[in-house]
Amino acid sequence: MEATGFPTSADIYLELDGRKIAVVQGYTARASKSSQSVEAFGESEPVATIEGQRKYTLELTRLYATEDAVTDGINFYELRDFSLVICKPDRKVIYSGCQWSAIQEEGQLNAMVAEKVTVVASKRIETTA
């Protein structure tokens, strides 16, 4: 059995119009669903549940723009409808239709800028690597 390794920061990136525009050092993904219970008169427990819409929220840390993106003048504050691509050893996870909902920057003298971007995605798909 061959060990393929874990994702690295080069394996997590933002994509816009098929082009890699930034690499991401870390991420946290949360999925939620607005499911509801169906109650019936006279029943002590719900009789069914209805699947609701899914919502994908991602926290990205330490984004670094690619050289091409810097040359093209891409600004994180103006990004819309982009994708987050996460390459894992056995599959690729793509969050598409992304919009940012919060951008946080922290800076100190003689230290790197730490960025955190909160993203909401409309779709999540998995493909085999």
Regions found by a protein language model. Name each.
Residues 120-127:
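Hydrophobic lipid-interacting interfaces of membrane-associated proteins
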Residues 1-64, 89-116, 129:
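Solvent-exposed edge beta-strands and adjacent loop segments
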Residues 67-69, 127:
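Short, cysteine-centered beta-strand-loop-beta hairpins and adjacent loop/turn segments enriched
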Residues 70-96:
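Short, acidic/charged, Gly/Pro-enriched secondary-structure junctions
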Residues 39, 84-85, 125:
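Short alpha-helical interface elements
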